[in-house]
C-alpha cells in the first residue's frame, strides 16, 4: 500500500531549482507552497525581474511566498499554518534558521550541487571546473543550521567533460539533482535511508563568485586559463583588456609549448583564431565578446578589429 502523499513546501530561486520543482509537481506529493526570493529591480532600466522558480510556480498556479528574510515572524507563522510534512530546498539563497527548519514533520531536505562535504557553499559548479576536478555530483541531505553541513541522505556522481562549461554542467547537475530528490523521497517513505553525518575534516568551500574573479592573468598556464574560461561561463565571464576595453573570452583551446614570449602576447593569427602566449603553453582563442557588443566568432571579430602579432592583452 502506498503511503499518503506528503504536503511539501518547496524553497528555490534560480534555474538550477526548476527540474526539482517540476519533478515534485508531476509526482504524487502535494506542493502546498513555493518560497522564493523577492522580485528584484535589475539592469539600467530598473525593470522588475521575477525568479525562474516564481515563473514556473505561477504557470502551475501554486501558492507563492517571498519573504525578505526567512526568519520573519509573519513568514514563520504562515509556515506553521500550512502544517507541511517536508521542506524541499534547492538553491533558495538564504540559510534557514532552526525555528523554520523545525516546522515540518519530517524536516527539510536540501539538493546540493556537489559531493559533500566537498564544495560547500554558493558556487560549487564553477569551482569544481576551476580546480580541475574530473568528477562532481549531487547530494541530498537533511538540513541543519549550518551551510551545507547536514547529514547526507543520497549522492550521485556526475563526470566532468574536458570541454565542460559551468553553464552545461549546471544543467546536467540540476537534472541529476531532481532525479536524486525523487529517489530520496521514495526511500524516506519506505524507511530505507539512514542519514550519514558528514566528515567535517574533509570539507572544502565554494564561495560566491565576484566579477574580478574573471580577470585573466596571462602569466598563468594555458590549462588554468582554459579552466577559468569554462568555469566562469556565463558569469562573470573570463576577460582581458584590449585597447582599454574589456574583452570576454568564451572558447579556447590549449596548445602545448615551452614559454617563448611575453604572457598575453598574440603570437599567431589564423582565419578564425588567434594564439596567445601564456605562462605555460599557448591559448587558441575562437570566440569573444567586446564590451557592450554581442558574442561573436573570432573570424567575425578580426574583420572589424585589427589585431596583429605582438598585440598584448593585459
Q: What is the predicted function of each stretch?
A:
Residues 2-45:
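N-terminal Rossmann-like dinucleotide-binding module
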Amino acid at each position: 500500500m502506498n503511503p499518503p502523499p506528503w504536503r511539501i513546501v518547496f524553497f528555490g530561486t534560480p534555474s538550477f531549482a526548476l527540474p526539482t520543482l517540476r519533478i515534485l509537481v508531476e509526482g504524487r506529493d502535494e506542493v502546498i507552497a513555493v518560497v522564493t526570493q523577492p522580485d528584484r529591480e535589475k539592469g539600467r532600466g530598473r525593470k522588475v525581474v521575477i525568479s525562474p522558480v516564481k515563473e514556473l510556480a505561477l504557470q502551475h498556479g501554486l501558492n507563492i511566498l517571498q519573504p525578505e528574510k526567512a526568519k520573519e515572524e509573519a513568514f514563520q507563522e504562515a509556515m506553521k499554518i500550512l502544517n507541511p510534512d517536508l521542506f524541499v530546498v534547492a538553491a533558495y539563497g538564504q540559510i534557514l534558521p532552526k525555528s523554520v527548519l523545525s516546522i515540518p514533520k519530517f524536516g527539510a531536505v536540501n539538493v546540493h550541487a556537489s559531493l559533500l562535504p566537498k564544495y560547500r557553499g554558493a558556487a560549487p559548479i564553477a569551482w569544481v571546473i576551476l580546480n580541475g576536478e574530473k568528477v562532481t555530483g549531487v547530494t541530498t541531505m537533511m538540513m541543519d543550521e549550518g551551510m551545507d553541513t547536514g547529514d547526507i541522505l543520497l549522492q550521485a556522481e556526475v563526470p566532468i567533460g574536458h570541454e565542460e562549461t559551468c553553464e552545461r554542467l549546471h544543467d546536467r547537475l540540476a537534472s541529476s539533482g531532481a532525479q536524486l530528490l525523487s529517489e530520496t523521497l521514495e526511500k524516506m517513505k519506505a524507511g530505507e535511508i539512514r542519514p550519514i553525518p558528514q566528515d567535517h575534516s574533509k570539507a572544502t568551500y565554494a564561495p560566491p563568485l565576484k566579477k574580478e574573479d574573471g580577470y585573466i592573468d596571462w602569466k598563468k598556464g594555458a590549462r588554468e586559463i582554459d579552466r577559468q574560461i569554462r568555469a566562469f561561463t556565463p558569469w562573470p565571464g573570463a576577460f582581458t583588456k584590449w585597447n582599454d576595453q574589456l574583452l570576454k573570452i568564451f572558447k579556447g583551446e590549449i596548445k602545448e609549448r615551452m614559454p617563448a614570449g611575453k604572457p598575453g602576447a598574440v603570437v599567431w593569427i589564423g582565419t578564425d583564431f588567434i594564439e596567445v602566449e601564456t605562462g605555460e603553453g599557448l591559448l587558441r582563442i575562437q570566440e569573444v565578446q567586446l564590451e557592450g557588443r554581442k558574442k561573436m566568432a573570432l573570424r567575425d571579430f578580426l574583420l572589424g578589429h585589427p589585431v596583429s602579432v605582438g598585440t598584448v592583452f593585459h
